[in-house]
Regions:
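Conserved phosphate/anionic-ligand binding catalytic regions in large, soluble enzymes, centered on
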Residues: 97-116, 157-162
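Acidic-glycine-rich active-site phosphate/pyrophosphate-binding loop
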Residues: 77-96, 128-146, 186-194
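Short, small-residue-biased leader/transition segments that mark boundaries at the very start
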Residues: 2-3
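Functionally critical mobile loop/hinge segments
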Residues: 10, 18-75, 81, 175-232
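Soluble metallo-hydrolase cores and metallopeptidase-like ectodomains found primarily
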Residues: 63, 72-75, 89, 93-102, ...
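Alpha-helical support elements that line or immediately flank enzyme active sites
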Residues: 111-127, 168-175
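C-terminal structural cap/anchor segments
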Residues: 152-153, 157, 161-182
Length: 232
């Protein structure tokens, strides 16, 4: 009997968190109305831990040093820093650094990807602490929401969905409303959604940089009156 003829059982999600209740409108309403005190502990821990490993990734010699390469090759504007810090966190995590990371959807790389670029833009724009926490809630929930359709274990590169989520958080920080946020996500996914996961390793950092770049480009596309449609 050929292996291709063997029956394949579907994902068993019994007892796991039900994410099907999430949609972008509900996420948007939540992040704009939640008392920041209620999310400050968990988001604050993400800020502390993920910032620390990004700093270490830029200080040390890890993997291909994608974060450092980005800053050296392209300068230190906010867009480059946003990509570099997310990549640097992955440089460290994928190459032996034992510092803890606050995950998203079960993944450290995705946790760093949907938080560190948003933090860099929050610093650049000098937004209030409240706005920063709301932006991070948006990016984290947007990343989780996308995984509802992707699944918990998939050949789809999770950096892609997390990069799009970072774009959503950045759009919010820059003053974008609901339409800007959702079109940012759609545009970002149209750019890099063909990327597959080929394992957790050093090259994840470069995939993260590309995905964050797509998130930022997706937002700038919509600002300039451009967007991808079905089939594009």
């Amino acid at each position: 009997r050929r292996s291709s003829d063997l029956p394949v059982e579907g994902e068993n999600e019994e007892g796991l968190t039900d994410r099907s209740l999430l949609d972008m409108k509900s996420i948007w309403n939540f992040i704009n109305t939640v008392d920041v005190v209620d999310i400050k502990e968990v988001i604050g821990r993400q800020i502390e831990y993920n910032t620390a490993i990004a700093d270490e990734g830029l200080r040390g010699d890890y993997g291909a040093n994608i974060g450092s390469v980005l800053l050296s090759a392209y300068g230190d504007d906010v867009r480059t820093r946003a990509k570099a810090r997310a990549a640097a966190g992955s440089d460290a995590r994928m190459n032996g650094c034992e510092l803890p990371v606050i995950i998203n959807a079960g993944s450290g790389n995705q946790g760093m990807t949907c938080s560190l670029p948003v933090l860099e833009y929050a610093k650049e724009l000098n937004v209030t602490e409240e706005k920063k926490y709301r932006a991070l809630a948006l990016s984290n929930l947007t990343a989780i929401h996308q995984k509802t359709g992707i699944g918990r274990l998939s050949a789809y590169c999770g950096a892609v969905s997390a990069g799009a989520a970072a774009g959503a958080g950045i759009a919010y920080l820059c003053g974008g409303g609901y339409e800007e946020v959702i079109h940012t996500v759609v545009n970002a996914l149209a750019i890099v959604s063909g990327m597959v996961c080929d394992g957790a390793k050093a090259s994840c950092a470069a995939k993260i940089a590309a995905s964050v770049d797509a998130g930022i480009l997706g937002y700038n596309m919509y600002l300039n009156g451009q967007q991808f449609y079905a089939g594009d």
